[in-house]
């Protein structure tokens, strides 16, 4: 019925696009946003970013947004495969640019010195739950270096 598209992972300056596919939910949605402080002045300019990002043929599959999102997702899944091959526990089955792992604390300590990852939780006294995100700007060399470092653990 409703989903959103994040803009920054695909090169937008900021913002998210809420997409409502259920016509019944569209009624007065604009007023709800305004009443709850979610509508920015000149906010339609944010929409221009999404129009440019989503411009493409084939229902958008060839658009800049999908091209960049595909890159981010593929990089994340490449990282996930390396962690899984090393025996690391995947916390959530995510097909997106965000991957969640329970790392042994010593792995986390070593990797956190070199890589940005979100510390999420301590699922037990020997592991740290982390989130690793990729984006449109994630370089192959960075992913390969991370994989080398994981394999060296």
Region locations from a protein language model:
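Hydrophobic alpha-helical segments
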Residues: 15, 20, 57, 118, ...
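Short, basic, helix/turn surface patches
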Residues: 1-10, 33, 117-123, 148-153
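Conserved C-terminal alpha-helix-loop-beta "cap" of PLP-dependent enzymes
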Residues: 77-78, 82-151
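Active-site C-terminal subdomain of aminotransferase-like
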Residues: 1-98
């Amino acid at each position: 019925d409703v989903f959103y598209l994040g803009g920054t992972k695909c090169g937008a300056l900021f913002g998210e696009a809420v997409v409502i596919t259920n016509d019944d939910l569209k009624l007065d949605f604009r007023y709800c946003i305004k009443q709850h402080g979610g509508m920015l002045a000149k906010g339609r300019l944010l929409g221009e970013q999404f129009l440019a990002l989503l411009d493409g043929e084939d229902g958008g599959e060839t658009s800049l947004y999908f091209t960049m999102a595909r890159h981010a997702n593929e990089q994340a899944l490449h990282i996930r495969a390396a962690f899984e091959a090393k025996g690391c526990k995947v916390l959530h089955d995510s097909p997106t640019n965000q991957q969640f792992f329970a790392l042994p604390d010593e792995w986390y300590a070593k990797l956190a010195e070199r890589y940005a990852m979100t510390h999420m939780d301590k699922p037990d006294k020997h592991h740290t739950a982390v989130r690793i995100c990729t984006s449109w700007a994630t370089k192959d060399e960075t992913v390969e270096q991370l994989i080398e470092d994981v394999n060296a653990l």
